[in-house]
């Protein structure tokens, strides 16, 4: 993964984790994601940033999607 893409993915993941107040997001690193998944991560990021709050089931679904996007 290029350094620029890695930095962008890292920022997207960090933004998502802060928005969701996820405590264990530290285990997810940009290196865990393929550059091929960048668009999917960006889409998830945009969706998360648009909402002001999340139900527990939505948070679980987002965490599950992040897990699925890992290499």
UniProtKB/Swiss-Prot annotation:
It comes from the Bacteria. InterPro entries: UPF0435 (IPR009507). Pfam families: DUF1128. Belongs to the UPF0435 family. HAMAP family: UPF0435. This is UPF0435 protein BPUM_0734. The lineage of its organism: Bacteria, Bacillati, Bacillota, Bacilli, Bacillales.
